[in-house]
Curated annotation (Swiss-Prot):
EC number from the UniProt entry: 2.1.1.172
Organism: Shewanella baltica (strain OS195)
InterPro entries assigned to the protein according to its UniProt record, in alphabetical order: DNA_methylase_N6_adenine_CS, Mtase_sm_N, rRNA_ssu_MeTfrase_C, RsmC/RlmG, SAM-dependent_MTases_sf, Small_mtfrase_dom
Disulfide bonds: none
Gene Ontology terms for molecular function: 16S rRNA (guanine(1207)-N(2))-methyltransferase activity; nucleic acid binding
Protein name: Ribosomal RNA small subunit methyltransferase C
Length: 347
């Protein structure tokens, strides 16, 4: 089943006949594979690890699948070139200019740019957002509550440098000052959000192997290692920009941890002495509640004997019931008007 934006691309796939195509920020469907009906070859870069895992089993000699903030390359001046680049307009609008710059660095001169997105997702501002090295965006289609715009590469784009897309700032935490590196598209208030502040203000003493689930830009990871530098810390997230941010944050603070993508806890192995998280479950949507349920269930199985599990969750959402059903006896260590901090020790 194709998502609505993907269906709009299929409606307009004739312009891709025998093209070498790159798809950026694709969704959890098989659109890149479907394009092989007309395209000569397709490469696909997912910024969401779940989306990558959905497509990757279908890779072949004409369909290459990648996950990350960039395509793999040896020399930034020798990037692979494509006749057409398709960009799925990102939910995090600040990420859009990054994707356009990446697209331009991979297009042949006068190559075709297609940008698709849902009407409610910010794509209506596409014409204003396109950099000057692209021709003025033209609306090509309006269907399935989505818009499709087309453009072409007219000028020379700046080379892709990750450092151009990072904001670095100092953050005061209960553990002391840390330096945070935040890539575009990654959540940041440039101060401690209430949930993370509650967690860090009641940080337990941990030992051994510890997991930071949904690590984001690495705020919890850096604070944790500042207070307890001997920990063997693993940081997981589903978002490529978050993982890259976390790696930059750790490096900026002279810290080391294992940082890697995981769809929930599926890519983690073994058991942990500690699991800490300010998980991204705060919107109350049914799909998000399901992810929360899976995280709680799976993390309970991966906690060592005497292991510590501590997460902060929105007090107005039904996660306390989910947590209590899995762990039974647990403590609410602290709370404020928005969050509760849950603690469990595996006896």
């Amino acid at each position: 089943m194709l998502t609505n934006p993907s269906q709009v691309i299929i409606r307009n796939q004739d312009s891709l006949s025998q093209h070498k195509v790159l798809v950026l920020n694709h969704e959890a469907d098989l659109l890149p594979k479907a394009l092989l009906d007309v395209a000569a070859s397709v490469d696909a870069l997912a910024l969401d690890y779940h989306h990558y895992l959905h497509l990757a089993p279908h890779a072949n000699s004409k369909l290459r699948c990648y996950f990350g903030h960039d395509l793999p390359h040896q020399d930034p001046l020798e990037r692979e070139k494509y006749d057409t680049v398709i960009v799925y307009f990102p939910k995090a609008k600040p990420l859009a200019p990054y994707l356009f710059n990446l697209a331009a660095n991979h297009l042949v001169p006068n190559g075709q740019l297609l940008v698709v997105g849902e009407n409610k997702g910010g794509i209506k501002s596409l014409v204003k957002l396109l950099p000057e090295y692209f021709a003025t965006g033209m609306k090509l289609d309006n269907a399935r509550h989505c818009l499709l715009f087309g453009s072409s590469l007219e000028g020379s784009a700046p080379a892709m440098k990750l450092s151009d897309w990072v904001s670095q700032y100092q953050l005061s935490t209960p553990q002391g000052e840390i330096s945070i590196c935040n890539l575009v598209g990654v959540f940041s208030e440039k101060r401690l959000d209430l949930g993370t502040e509650l967690l860090l203000s009641h940080l337990p003493t941990l030992s051994g192997r510890v997991l930071d689930f949904g690590c984001g830009a690495g705020v919890i990871a850096a604070a944790l290692l500042k207070a307890q530098p001997s920990l063997s810390l693993e940081c997981v997230d589903i978002n490529a920009m978050a993982l890259a941010s976390c790696e930059l944050t750790l490096a900026a603070n002279g810290m080391t941890a294992k940082v890697y993508p995981s769809d929930g806890l599926a890519q983690t192995t073994g058991k942990f002495n500690g699991i800490i998280s300010n998980p991204p479950f705060h919107d109350g949507l049914a799909s998000t509640t399901s992810i929360a349920q899976n995280f709680v269930t799976d993390s309970a199985k991966q906690l060592q004997h005497n292991g510590i599990w501590q997460i902060v969750a929105n007090r107005h959402l039904p996660y306390s019931d989910i947590i209590a059903a899995e762990f039974g006896q647990l403590k609410v260590v602290a709370d404020n008007n928005k969050y509760k901090l849950y603690y469990f020790q595996h006896k």
